Amino acid sequence: MKNKIYKKIMITQGIKDIDQFKMEMYSILTSIVYDREIYKHNKELEELFLKLNIPCKPYLLKSRNQSIIKFLSVIHKSTYEELVEQLQILKKVMIESMEEDNKVETTEKTKESRL
């Protein structure tokens, strides 16, 4: 799933129409928030709020649905330039998450080879 989200981010970078860009951002953010491989616990979503410079009240972290509503309302109000900045942040989030997966896989392979 992470590879698909990353590919969608890369495709979205070339979109110039703000309405189309927003629709793609809705899709990307929803996929990231609901993917438990990226953020296993709701509390971890606070990190995403901070990276995107979105104010985060504690009640938002109790439910992924509430978090999504906040993210989507911010996207809806954003300018094209703000959306581009947010997309770059999401790209970094995905790269970090995929790199973490690679570290885990490498560690597991090393352990297996020692046995």
What are these regions (language model features)?
Residues 2-115:
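Basic helix-extension-helix modules of the SAP/HeH family
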